[in-house]
């Protein structure tokens, strides 16, 4: 564990970027990714008409209005314009069965409004990356860091083995056993 912590701290952003650039073809999406905004409000909330207009727009004034509104009224609010989120993670928040079977639904329908008996769900998709496309660096960063840690761990273990062997050899502490081939 101590080795892992030391190695994790030794991984630089430059190493991550270099590994990503050199091995882009290894990083493919298993699920589509989206950037956008999600808000879930009770059906009894005031000003739902405004929310219907606001959630479709991506500008600072409207986002501020939505954030203030969500503090007072929303059960759930997620602003993810600045980070990629997997479609299954988004689908878990909204009762829309088509997302279970058609992952590209959100590429074709960038504004989604769904109601159930208690809530109204609003989802705006600003950006969409399809399955099997290259993972964005931000989304692949943790995976790359783990790969680099594992590579350094193997390198460290091999160096320790080599050092131990060399020290034992220098001190004549190595005993060789030969099998008798006559038996």
Placement of each model-derived feature along the sequence:
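Peptidyl-prolyl cis-trans isomerase
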Residues: 1-183
């Amino acid at each position: 564990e101590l080795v892992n912590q030391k190695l994790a701290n030794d991984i630089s952003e430059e190493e991550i970027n270099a590994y990503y650039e050199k091995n882009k073809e290894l990083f493919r999406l298993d699920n589509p990714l989206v950037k956008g905004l999600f808000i879930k409000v009770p059906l009894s909330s005031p000003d739902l008409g405004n929310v219907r207009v606001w959630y479709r727009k991506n500008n600072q004034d409207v986002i501020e209005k939505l954030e203030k509104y969500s503090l007072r009224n929303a059960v759930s609010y997620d602003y993810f314009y600045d980070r990629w989120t997997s479609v299954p993670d988004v689908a878990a928040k909204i009762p829309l069965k088509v997302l279970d079977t058609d992952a590209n639904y959100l590429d074709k329908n960038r504004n989604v409004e769904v109601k159930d008996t208690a809530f109204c769900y609003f989802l705006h998709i600003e950006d969409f990356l399809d399955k099997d496309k290259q993972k964005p660096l931000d989304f692949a960063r943790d995976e790359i860091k783990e790969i680099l840690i594992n590579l350094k761990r193997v390198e460290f273990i091999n160096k320790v083995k080599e050092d131990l062997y060399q020290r034992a050899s220098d001190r004549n502490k190595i005993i060789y056993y030969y099998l008798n081939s006559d038996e």
